[in-house]
Design a protein with these regions (language model features):
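GST-like domain detector, emphasizing the conserved glutathione-binding G-site
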Residues: 1-157, 163
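GST-like fold's C-terminal all-alpha helical module
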Residues: 121-209
């Protein structure tokens, strides 16, 4: 589970928040799956919308919560959790009724989560190539914090890849070659899912959980 230490968090106000809070963006794939998951489990939460199109994720306020500048972020009674798949696992453990990650399917679901996580860059490439309004491509992207992101007191290597994406996006955007490669990779995985759905109502069987 990726739970941030208090010393990793610069926006200290969230440490005193009570209840469950979710920082999210309407059209973020990772935000959408988290909202769907919470909806299926009937989890009440306070939402905080971060507009990625306006680069609000690069604001000092949000980078003070998660230097990775990514949504979603879950705050539970002042504890900050990042990475959507880890958030799903955390919530399923915290609210065990109507488990969506049942023990008898946990290994298979974990493997699917790893595969899905590996597709994040492809999803981002396609999103920024085809869905981000063209006029925003001409807007100067607010600079990411100069300070290195830390995770559990150590430099966050995951943030290096995130920075590299934004640096390349500022310079050349998403090229046709990159977008095509990402689309083909996504199609490959979606075809595999469609094949499973020809035999079952859901990916892992005829029951949701």
């Amino acid at each position: 589970m990726v739970k941030l230490r208090q010393e990793d968090i610069k926006t200290k106000e969230v440490l005193s928040w009570k209840g469950i809070h979710l920082f999210h963006f309407t059209f973020s794939a990772c935000s959408m799956k988290t909202r769907i998951f919470m909806g299926l489990k009937n989890i009440d939460y306070t939402g905080h919308h971060i507009n990625l199109q306006k680069k609000e994720n690069f604001s000092p306020y949000f980078q003070g919560i998660t230097p990775r500048s990514l949504v979603p972020v879950l705050v539970d009674d002042g504890e900050v959790h990042i990475e959507s798949n880890d958030i799903l696992k955390y919530l399923d453990n915290k609210f065990p009724a109507k488990s969506l990650i049942p023990a008898h399917k946990e290994e298979e679901i974990n493997q699917m989560m790893i595969e899905e996580n590996d597709l994040h860059l492809d999803i981002r490439n396609v999103t920024f190539k085809f869905l981000v309004p063209k006029f925003l491509n001409n807007v100067k992207i607010q600079e990411k914090s100069k300070s290195k992101a830390t995770l559990h007191g150590n430099e966050d290597s995951e943030d290096d890849a995130n920075r590299k994406f934004w640096e390349n996006y500022k310079k050349i955007g998403i090229t046709d070659e990159v977008a095509t490669k990402s689309l083909l990779n996504l199609k490959l995985h979606l075809d595999e899912i469609n094949e499973k759905l020809t035999h079952h109502t859901y990916i892992l069987g005829n029951e949701l959980c």
